[in-house]
Every structure is written in C-alpha cells, then in structure tokens.
C-alpha cells in the first residue's frame, strides 16, 4: 500500500511528489478509497506534527485533496472540509474552496467557479509543472511559488 511506502518520508513536499509519481493523473485507474485512506492518515499525521511543533503536511494534504476532488462527488465534501478547516490556516488556504463549491454545484461553471473539467485540468497542469520544477531544481524538492490559483 502507498501509505506504507511513504510514511517514513519526513517532508510533506517529498510525500506529495511520491504520491503524484506513483498515482499519476489517469483518474480512471486511481482508487478513490485509497485516496480517502491516505488523506485520513495525512490528517492524523498533521495533527500529531502540530502537537509536536513540527508542522509540514500542507503540500501533501493539498495534493491528496486535489486527487479526491478529481475522483470525488458531493459525498466527499465533509472530508475536504474537515481537512480544510480542521488543522490551521496554512492548510485552510492550501485547499481550494473552488473544489468544494464545484462538488456542491455539480461541476457547473458559475460566477466564482470554473467548470469541473477546467479545475481538473488546472490541477494536473500545475502538478505536472511542479514535478518538472522539482526534477530540475538545484535545491531538491521545492514547489513552485503558490501564486498559481485555479
């Protein structure tokens, strides 16, 4: 299971990269239940890290929430909200409200929300670029600036 392979990776950015490389972006081949399992484990880890004053789970939680959005439906909103609002402001700002709004409205474009197809494309494009950046970074696994919003 993916969690067993990643649980000893200290930094969230490295775990995020590991999951993206293992899962890829062919959402028809990704098990939604595995993403839910990974999200719950990462959430538990984030709570433990916060209690020990070492907090580094934002990027990994964001990646896994993005995967859940791409695979999910309205029934997944409570888990996305639990993660978005249940830890701290860092995680809250990393999880896009647009993902939750899109699941609530059936993926239809409105004044503040792109279509589900556009949001998924933005997620994939961002993380493909992020992987490329990590691959060629002098310093290792550092993500692009968080100035890209979907």
Language model features with spans:
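Long, contiguous interaction/recruitment modules in multidomain scaffold/adaptor proteins
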Residues: 73-120
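Residue-level signature for tetratricopeptide repeat
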Residues: 66-70, 135
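TPR-adjacent "capping" and linker segments in tetratricopeptide-repeat scaffold/adaptor proteins
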Residues: 4-10, 51-52, 107-127
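Long, acidic/serine-threonine-rich intrinsically disordered regions with weak helical/coil propensity
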Residues: 1-29, 145-149
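Generic helix N-cap/helix-start motif at coil->alpha-helix transitions
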Residues: 11-19, 56-62, 88-94, 122-130
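Amphipathic alpha-helical scaffolding segments comprising HEAT/armadillo-like alpha-solenoid repeats
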Residues: 1-6, 29-51, 73-84
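Alpha-helical segment of the N-proximal tetratricopeptide repeat
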Residues: 125-150
């Amino acid at each position: 299971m993916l969690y067993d392979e990643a649980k000893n990776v200290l930094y969230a950015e490295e775990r995020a990269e590991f999951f993206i490389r293992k899962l890829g972006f062919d959402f028809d081949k990704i098990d939604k239940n595995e993403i839910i399992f990974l999200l719950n484990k990462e959430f538990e880890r984030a709570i433990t890290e916060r209690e020990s004053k070492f907090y580094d789970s934002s990027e990994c939680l964001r990646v896994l929430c993005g995967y859940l959005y791409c695979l999910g439906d309205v029934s997944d909103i409570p888990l996305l909200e639990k993660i978005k609002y249940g830890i701290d402001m860092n995680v809250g700002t990393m999880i896009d409200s647009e993902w939750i709004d899109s699941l609530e409205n059936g993926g239809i474009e409105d004044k503040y929300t792109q279509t589900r197809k556009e949001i998924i494309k933005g997620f994939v494009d961002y993380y493909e670029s992020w992987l490329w950046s990590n691959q060629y970074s002098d310093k290792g696994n550092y993500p692009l600036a968080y100035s890209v919003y979907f």
